[in-house]
Amino acid sequence: EISACLVGSEMCIRDRINKIAATYYYRQLRSENGKAGLDYLKKRELSDSTINSFGLGYATQSTGNLYKLLKDKGYDDDILKESGLFTYERGIHEKFWNRVIFPIMDINNKVIGFGGRVMGDAKPKYLNSPETRLFDKSRNLYGLNIARMSRKPNMIICEGYMDVISMHQAGFNQAVASLGTALTPGHARLLKRYTDNVLITYDSDEAGVKAALRAIPILKEAGLSTKVINMRPYKDPDEFIKAMGAEAFQERIDNAENSFMYEIGTMLRNYDRGDPESETAFEREVAAKLVTFKEKLERDNYLKAVCRQFMIPEDGMRQMVSRLGNQEGIISRNAGAGTMQPTVERKPKKKREDGLRQAEKMLLTWLISDRDIFDKVAAYIKPEDFIDPLFSGVAEKVYEQYGTGNISPAAIIA
C-alpha cells in the first residue's frame, strides 16, 4: 500500500489511509454487524441508491479492527496518529464507534475526513474528524463534490449532513453544508467559484437564525447574491421535505427572501412598533444598515423596498440615512439636490489582482518543477485556495499527478 506512493509523499499516504477507512466503514454498514446503522438510515427514509452515492458507512461498537487493518497494510503509529481516526489516550482507540459514518470528500472526490452520528440520544450527536493537513473545515463543504456538477442556478447551504443528503435525494443536488463549523470567508470564496447565487436554509430555531445572520455579510463580501429559505413551521429541510415533499420545497426556493430584507424582518422582532420610541429606534437601526451600501443606486433601491415593505415614511428615512452617512463620512449631500453620494470612490484593484495572479503563476511553476517544494507547500495550500479559476484547475492536475507519482507537464498544460 505504502510503496504505491512516492517516498516522502505524506499527502498520498494520508489519502490512502482515508480511502481504506472509508471502504472499511462502507463494508461494515452492509455486513451483519452494521444492521443497526442500516436500520437507522432506512428509518430516515434514505434509499439504497442515496446511501451508496454518499458512500455512507458504519463504525461498529467493537473497536480495534480498523487499526489492525491499517497496521497489517504497513502503516505505522506516527502516520496513524495524524490521520484523525484514532485517539491515543490510555491506549489506542478508534475515534468513531457505534456511529453512522459520513465520508467527507473534497471537490476531486477524495476522502479527506469523516463525520459520525449516533443513532440514539447520546452526546455529542455528531463527531467530526479533527483538522489535519488534508482536512481543513474552513475550506471544504460537505456535498460540494456533487453540487458543483449540478448545473443549477444556485447553491443551497444547509446545516448538516442529513439535510444535504435528504435534499439531494429529493432532487436538489446543489445542496452543501459546512463541516461542524460556522460559515467562513473560505467557504464563501469556494462557493463563488461555482455560483453567484446562494440560498440559506439553516434550521428555523433561534440558533439557525443567528447562524444565518452571521453568514449573510460573509457571503455578501464574497460577491454572492444571497436569499433565505423559510422552513417554518418545520425545523430543517430534511423535516420539511419528509412532511411536504419536493414540490413544496421548490416553492419555498422560488419564494426565498432577499437576505437584507430577512435581516430587517429579524431585527423587527426586537421592537414594539406600537410604541413611538421603539418605532424610532427601529427606524434608526434600519437607517444604519442602509448606510452600509456603498453604491447610491443600490442603497436607494433598498431604501425604497424597505420603506414599502415595512411601512416606513420614505422621506424621513432618506433624511436619516443621509444624516447618518454624513456623520460617518460615508455619504455627502449635494447642496440643494437632496441626493446622496459616496465621499470616497473605490480605487481600482487591478494592480493588486495582477500581483496575486503573477504570484499564483510563479508558485505553480515551482510546484511543477520541484518535488521537494511541492511536498512542503501541499501540506498548507490546496488547489481550491488558488483564486484564479484557471490556475486552480491546473493545480488540481498537479496535485493529482503527484499523488499517482506520474508528473507530466505536457499533460497538465493540456
What function would you assign to each model-found segment?
Residues 51-64, 84-87, 95, 316-325:
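Short linear loop/turn motifs
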